[in-house]
Amino acid sequence: MLTAFKLNNFKSFQDEAVLPLGGALTVLIGANAAGKSNVLEALRLLSWLASGNKLGAIQREVNRADKVVRGRVPDLFRRGEHRFALGCQVQDAAGDSSLSMALELRGDDLHIVAERMDTGTGVPLYDMDQPSQGELATEAGVAYNNFLKGGNKPHIKVTDQMAVFAQLDSPASFHANHRKAQQEIPKVCKAYQALLSNVLFLDPVPARMRDFSFLADKRLGGDGANLSSVLYQLWCEGELRGELLSFIQSLPEQDITGLDFLKGPRGDVMVQLIETFSGTPRRFEAALLSDGTLRVLAIAAAMLSAPEGSLVVIEEIDNGVHPSRARHLLERIQAVAERRNLRVLLSTHNPAMLDALPDKAVPDVVFCYRDTRSGDSRLVRLGSLPDAPELFIQDSLGHLMTSGALDRFVKTHPGPEARKQQARAWLAALRTSAPGVVE
């Protein structure tokens, strides 16, 4: 599973920023224009590359409704830069591994100029050490681990218009004599492809969720348009019915006792909620449900249908969720994530949602802010802050953010090392003014 995502020189980010994903639930917070959307956009780009897409198609993606990136290709880079980097860390049964890649702008086109995958053995699984040269060139050289002694590793040719790990998923890519390379490298590359391409970026669009969807469409889309068919599959599995109803209890002023489905003539379905008041059941199909109800249903479908070990990203989770039910919803998300071995990344700027976070999720909150001097975006995990307990005892997390106390603490609070330096400086000044003072 993904344990961290990295970016450098991407849009508002300059120095390498790390988004830790070590806990079941990570919440990304920060003011408007702090850079939260840029983090998610960079992660979306890496996921898009893992699906085998070519860089030449990226500008077309800008014009799509579910676009990968916003703006023009040159807008992806930190101002004044012509290269940015993306990467991630992964943990699985085989151990820890990491992926890093750098992309460069030549003329109007993007090129991958560096890509490397490490598995902790001291020798990279592969390393693009011969990038293409020239504005029109796209052929690059990649050294790969042949698992034999000797520092000189064999090379193969790849295109710099696709992620290298999306090209090395076949044993035929390697020399016939390098049997272990033929076995190991495609296996790891396929695992990375599956893990990254299966990241679900959930940003439900209620208007698209009020129609029938085809039963064959079993993987929830980011906009939730096929919500009904995914819920149908989950409901038919039986053992997940209780989990679904528990999520739906996040809805206020409703007593939902079950789901039903309208069936169309083309193998399509539309979900119905069964609501019971005073012992009388009534059915309400998706076309009649509120935006908030549809969003909660989409979150439930995402959490229960995502492949185990995968990452689910829920953007602006507070939209349509009543504050009185926020805690229940977040507790359900965390419980299901832990049970199904998922990683969940939420973004929000709603103080009520932050105050509703389960206590054990608070250290994994990641604060995104702009540096006061350089203006670049930065990320910090609250649990990693020096003297973090000193911050948390002051007030609730939501009020700390809205009052500006969190922002001031992160930007101005001296950590232990800074305090040591201040103490040394004070002692040095004391010795200078009073020569008789000893240590």
Which stretches of residues belong to each language-model region?
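Pre-Walker A-like glycine/lysine-rich segment at the N-terminus of P-loop NTPase domains
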Residues: 1-83
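Catalytic acidic motif of RecA-like/P-loop NTPases
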Residues: 11, 44, 318-321, 351-352
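Short loop/turn elements that form and flank the Walker-type P-loop nucleotide-binding site
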Residues: 21-23, 306-308, 339-341
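P-loop NTPase motor core
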Residues: 67-121, 201, 382-387, 391
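C-terminal lobe/lid and adjacent interdomain/linker elements of RecA-like ASCE P-loop ATPase modules
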Residues: 78, 251, 328-439
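Short glycine-/polar-rich loops that comprise or flank the Walker A/P-loop
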Residues: 82-84, 110, 197-198, 361-364, ...
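Electropositive, glycine-dotted interaction segments
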Residues: 95-246, 250, 254
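Conserved ABC ATPase signature
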Residues: 226, 249, 253, 257-304, ...
